[in-house]
Amino acid sequence: MKQLVTFEVQDGENEYRDYGIYDHKYSDEEIIKHFYGLDNIDEENGWYWKDTSIVRINNAEDIDRDKIKIMKDYGVAYEHNI
């Protein structure tokens, strides 16, 4: 089973969320590096620096194939393989 990962991003006063679908076997750091295309990231109190923004995994919950299809159909989240 895969997991729906919710990223929380803070960029100055702006806050937003991104979504991705990953296998359970990856760490938060690996997922963040892959999703944002980063080679090296610095961690501070559970947040990771991405240029001038900070990002963390806010939530990760199991998702089944039917829900994955719905997320893809609506362009909300896609499956990622590291």
Which positions does each model-derived feature cover?
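A short, exposed loop/beta-hairpin motif centered on an aromatic-Gly-Thr core
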Residues: 15-26
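A broad, structure-centric signal for solvent-exposed, well-ordered loop/edge residues
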Residues: 28-29, 64
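Short amphipathic, charge-patterned alpha-helical segments
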Residues: 31-36
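Intrinsically disordered, low-complexity segments enriched in Ser/Pro/Gly/Ala and basic residues
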Residues: 5, 26, 51-52
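Short aromatic-glycine-(Arg/Gly/Cys) micro-motifs in beta-strand/loop hairpins
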Residues: 2-15
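Short, mixed-charge low-complexity intrinsically disordered segments
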Residues: 38-82
